[in-house]
């Protein structure tokens, strides 16, 4: 309610041109819808409900990018393709048979994605969906991410006859937003990256071995999408004597610059 298809057409069509591609039409249409979300920017025609129209438009574009069509293929085909591409762990095909994946496929409700706001779809794309970070290509859609995460969590559940029930319950709760998962968990489950800590606290002592070891650990954890907390309270201030005054401490600033460089060198955002 409170949205108008004709208003979207009126807003987007002036930007169309001869020879325009369908991708460009999608992008211009999305931009027009997003502009209508802001009631201050469009006081007479805008409404916050356009955020859900924009979500549907962005989802349509995502599915075309990932699957080449709006309707997703079978879950087994998606998993098999992404395992072959090295984006999913090969263990997924060891833990579960094709029949198991087909059973999970029946549990998925892809229509849930159509109820998401534009901001929610963009957040899933930007933070959680498996992608090639060099090319930007995305390889799954939100409901697939939730199901692969559920399958990974319960792959060792005993008895095996109960696994599918647990997977279904977990998937339904996660996809309905009844609980949230930390970014490295939701983004990493089912992938070759086995690091699920959102925040890692690293403590540095006031000696070179510890200072340089802290920098190494920061870089390694950052490369696996972990957030970093650094405790530096043990470092002495500038000018403090070292080895009885043979040399003096250079203070925190040089080491803070070093640690910042270590972090930025491998940060994945």
Predicted regions and their residues:
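Extended catalytic cores of very large enzyme megasubunits
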Residues: 1-269
